[in-house]
Amino acid sequence: MRLSVRRVLLAAGCALVLVLAVQLGQQVLECRAVLAGLRSPRGAMRPEQEELVMVGTNHVEYRYGKAMPLIFVGGVPRSGTTLMRAMLDAHPEVRCGEETRIIPRVLAMRQAWSKSGREKLRLDEAGVTDEVLDAAMQAFILEVIAKHGEPARVLCNKDPFTLKSSVYLSRLFPNSKFLLMVRDGRASVHSMITRKVTIAGFDLSSYRDCLTKWNKAIEVMYAQCMEVGKEKCLPVYYEQLVLHPRRSLKLILDFLGIAWSDAVLHHEDLIGKPGGVSLSKIERSTDQVIKPVNLEALSKWTGHIPGDVVRDMAQIAPMLAQLGYDPYANPPNYGNPDPFVINNTQRVLKGDYKTPANLKGYFQVNQNSTSSHLGSS
């Protein structure tokens, strides 16, 4: 009996020693970590150097970081940004997804903090320096882009007004590239007015006001694009993308360093399919990009702009001429379409396309009026 008691006491003692040893080991490791942190200079922990790791449905692991070649698609709303991102989304290696809406707002806030001398002083005094803010912006933007859709080898973001911050974004993501969608401002404004696309600061009851605001917005974006440089920012003319999709998309994919895929010419066939094109049920362009690329949206603005605005067009929107559009031509000669596009237009006129099942009930595609409401914008 005594022997049994001794064995029990011995076993208990060994267990106690083992627990104490484990706890001591943990404390040693924690102390080393603390000491290492004290010896490191301030800011040695760099979250912007960390990677996001995601696993796709194909069980492939994707790693995303600040050095990745992100693609940013933007431009004044109603300039073809949705069509462009749908075409890219059709590529098997690319995922753009719907507008996040939040990224341009956060970028605008960041810009406001920088412009306000008093606010910047307060932030600096609190230790919230430009370096801290930039690291936080970098992590936030990457997190939103990466996690608001399925993982892919190449990620892109389409929020139209992000390209007002191209220079800043190119600093946060040094290997990023930008596609600036450019469209005849008269067509963009007619589209936003007739489709009642609310944009902050635009008076949708006035063509003159909207064209003035269009001019200001595209002027800022174009200047940012030029400052970033032609190696990183490519102006993409909506009219040429629609008239000559194969030629335009080859130039775009070459610029982005992405291999060619015929899928980009048939985005409408991949809508709502796994790994294909995901469309928002509430974005204004959704009911248009379900159709193949077609022609009539190019010039359906003709005859709708008030006469006094037409007369003053060169003064109201000087960026038209700078971008290569004739402000006095109504409409300009944008060029001759490829046979492929003519065939697509005939398909649309016949109603030879289907609304994806997941989008039915959220908008109506009136096939009886397609002859006057064609196009993807």
From Swiss-Prot:
Its localization reads:
Golgi apparatus membrane
- UniProt KW Manganese keyword: no
Which residues are noted as glycosylation sites? 343, 368
- InterPro entries in the record: P-loop_NTPase, TPST-like
Q: What sections of the protein cross the membrane?
A: 9-25
Catalyzed reactions per annotation: L-tyrosyl-[protein] + 3'-phosphoadenylyl sulfate = O-sulfo-L-tyrosine-[protein] + adenosine 3',5'-bisphosphate + H(+)
Query: Mind telling me how this protein is modified after translation?
Result: N-glycosylated.
- Location of region: Interaction with peptide substrate: 101-105
**Alphabetic keyword roster:** Disulfide bond, Glycoprotein, Golgi apparatus, Membrane, Signal-anchor, Transferase, Transmembrane, Transmembrane helix
The residues annotated as site (Transition state stabilizer) are 158, 285
Summarize where 3'-phosphoadenylyl sulfate binds, as residue positions.
78-82, 183, 191, 195, 238, 285-294, 300
GO BP annotations, alphabetical order: 3'-phosphoadenosine 5'-phosphosulfate metabolic process; fusion of sperm to egg plasma membrane involved in single fertilization; peptidyl-tyrosine sulfation; prevention of polyspermy
The record gives the effect of mutating residue 99 to A as:
Loss of sulfotransferase activity
An example of a GO molecular function for this protein is: protein homodimerization activity
State the family named in the UniProt similarity comment for this chain. Belongs to the protein sulfotransferase family.
> What name does UniProt use for this protein?
Protein-tyrosine sulfotransferase 2
The species this protein belongs to is Homo sapiens (Human)
Q: Which gene encodes it?
A: TPST2
